[in-house]
Amino acid sequence: MASRRTKSPDQIVSLRETLVSAGLEPRLADLLDAMPHRLIQVEPRRPFREPGAPRSEVMFVRSGILAKFKPDASGGRQIVALRFPGEGILPGKAPAHYGIQAIVRSQVMVGEARDFTALVEQHPAMRQFFCRLLQRNEDIGYEWLVNCGRRDATSRVAHLLCETAVRMNRGDGGLANPFTQQQIADMTGQTSVNVNRVLADMERQGLIRRKGREIEFVDWAEMRRIGSFQPAYLEI
């Protein structure tokens, strides 16, 4: 689920509008929009769902950003996926092998898996739609794997910033950076000290300009080149 409107993490997006914009028939979007759900405000200070929790819910991010994370034995963690406004987390049969935590204060629609599954099973077009969403999430996961496994520190951060700008529909102008340097480190497999150095180097090289949390892409084409960023994998 991904709306094409420009959005910031604190902007509330509509489930129905997002589904229709992504290609689902309006009548099917209406069924999902009418499904029983709770609206939950998720604070970023502690996990929303711990690793090993049942995947008995379907989630839709109305505002904010959710992160999936994997802890390690030393107490550290790797952020392995993000969900921006207009994106969601689908249920599954097995317990989750990841935790969920908000990057910023977020509003999340949470429904029961049994209600969601019943609708999907009744409507083949809905099933096909969510298969496409799962394929998109898988493609994003492959990009993240390559980013952490094969690219250098600067390329990793460049790719993350480019992807974030596109997923937030901010285009090539820049973005209000929603991440702390530690969060960027947890996403790109490096230390926060190294992330600070990379961002400073990007600014010195004339690639970006920073003012508070705002990051302006001074040279978008070069940022894309450095990060090997080709956005086709983000399409549904």
What kind of feature is each model-predicted range?
Residues L39, L82, V110, P178, ...:
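Short aromatic/basic micro-patch
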Residues M1-P44, P85-I89:
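Cyclic nucleotide-binding regulatory module and flanking cytosolic helices
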Residues R46-V104:
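Cyclic nucleotide-binding regulatory domains
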Residues E121-G189:
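Polybasic "coupling" helices that flank or enter modular domains
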Residues A53, V61, E112, D219, ...:
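Histidine- and aromatic-rich ligand-binding microenvironments
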Residues A165-I236:
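Phosphate-/nucleic-acid-contacting segments
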Residues I79-D139, E143:
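Cyclic-nucleotide recognition modules
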